[in-house]
Every structure is written in structure tokens, then in C-alpha cells.
A protein has these predicted regions:
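C-terminal-of-GTPase-core extension/linker across diverse P-loop GTPases
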Residues: 2-8, 13, 19, 147-215
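Conserved Switch II/interswitch segment of TRAFAC-class P-loop GTPases
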Residues: 43-48, 75-85, 96-158, 171-185, ...
Length: 215
């Protein structure tokens, strides 16, 4: 199964341009207006590996299959996405399917390219996205905790899992990402954690989109 990486960021920061560059394709429309991308663009890219190349030279197999990465170009996120603003739930659902997040951040000035918040501020943009991911995790965890509490009556293991979910919810409410939560050994909680697909538990790679003079 290929590793899936979701390309995310605010509208008009260069996500689709990066997607086209990574996949050597022009499948994703890149335009100077918000929500140019609505449905996610997807492409599978083979991963170069010199070790495989060396083995191919030695063995001369009939067929060579490299590891692959699935890149997914996801619609732009805006402040309030966790409450349904912009493409809201659709955007967050698309991210949930990815194993890792590639966050594109605009770091260049250009009066001809609009910024959804009116000015270029990379740190503010990162905070906006990570806040929305955290709020979405809080919502999902809160709902799951409520269900687990109802199911825990008379079931010791379920009660332990519900208590652990409460600890996770407190952790998130304190502004901490799920990736820093230290869970106790509890199979029922581990299963619930996996089903939640917490956004702040995913690895994040930051991509700074700079002007040519900064390269």
C-alpha cells in the first residue's frame, strides 16, 4: 500500500502548482482565486531508489516495481473550517484519509496574487491551519467520548477506554496535538484512536513557497 501525503494550506498559496511539480503533471488547475481546487487531485509517483537500480543491473528482472507515494492536492482551508466555513468538513475528511500532511505556506509578496487574509504572514497561516485541525480533533474526540461513556456501563474494559478518551480530550482542549499524547496500554482505546484518524496525530512537512530571489 502506497504512502499517501495530503497537500494542504490556505487558498492561493501554491498547493496545486506544487502538486503538478511533484507529479510531473498538469492535472491540477492552478489559478489566482480561492477554492480553484474543490475535488481533490490525486496522483501516484514512483520513488527513485539507487539500491533497486543496483539490483536491477545485477539481476535483470523482467519487471521492476518501485515503492510509490500517493500525492493528494486538497482544497484550501480557511479559518472556521472546523465549523463548516469554506469547504469545511469535505476538506477535513480528505485530510483524514492521508498518512501525512504536506503544508504549503506562502512566504512571498505579490500584489497580483490575493491572500485570503489580506497579508502575507507565514506564522499566522500555520497557526490558522493547525488550530482548525486541532478543533476538528476536539469535536471528533468529544463525540466519541460521549458514545464510549454510554457503552461503558457494566464493562470494565470499556470504562478504562472511556477514561483514556477523556484524558485525550483534556489534552487536546489544552491546545496540545494528538501526536504528543501518551496513551496507556488499552486495546479498546487503541482501536478507537485508529478509527478517529486524528488530524493532529499525523506527521507534518512544511513547504515554504518563496519568491525566486530567495532560492
Amino acid at each position: 500500500m502506497a504512502l499517501s501525503i495530503g497537500i494542504v494550506g490556505l487558498p492561493n498559496v501554491g498547493k496545486s502548482t506544487l502538486f503538478n511539480a511533484l507529479t510531473k503533471a498538469q492535472n491540477a488547475q492552478a489559478a489566482n482565486y480561492p477554492f480553484c481546487t474543490i475535488e481533490p487531485n490525486k496522483a501516484t509517483v514512483p520513488v527513485p531508489d539507487r539500491r533497486i537500480d543496483a539490483l536491477v543491473d545485477l539481476v535483470h528482472p523482467q519487471k521492476t516495481i518501485n515503492a510509490t507515494v500517493d500525492f493528494i492536492d486538497i482544497a484550501g482551508l480557511v479559518r472556521g473550517a472546523s465549523k463548516g466555513e469554506g469547504l469545511g468538513n469535505q476538506f477535513l475528511g480528505n485530510i483524514r484519509e492521508c498518512a501525512a500532511i504536506l503544508e504549503v505556506v506562502r512566504c512571498f509578496e505579490d500584489d497580483d496574487i490575493t491572500h485570503v487574509d489580506g497579508s502575507v504572514d507565514p506564522l499566522r497561516d500555520i497557526e490558522t491551519i493547525e488550530t482548525e485541525l486541532l478543533l476538528a480533533d476536539i469535536q471528533g474526540t468529544s463525540k466519541r467520548h460521549e458514545r464510549m461513556v454510554k457503552m461503558s456501563k457494566g464493562d470494565k474494559d470499556a470504562r478504562v477506554a472511556a477514561d483514556e478518551m477523556a484524558r485525550l480530550l483534556e489534552h487536546l482542549n489544552n491546545g496540545n496535538p494528538a501526536s504528543t499524547f501518551e496513551a496507556k496500554d488499552c486495546p479498546a482505546f487503541a482501536a478507537a484512536w485508529h478509527e478517529l484518524g486524528l488530524l493532529t496525530a499525523k506527521k507534518i512537512i512544511y513547504c515554504a513557497n518563496v519568491d525566486e530571489d530567495s532560492l
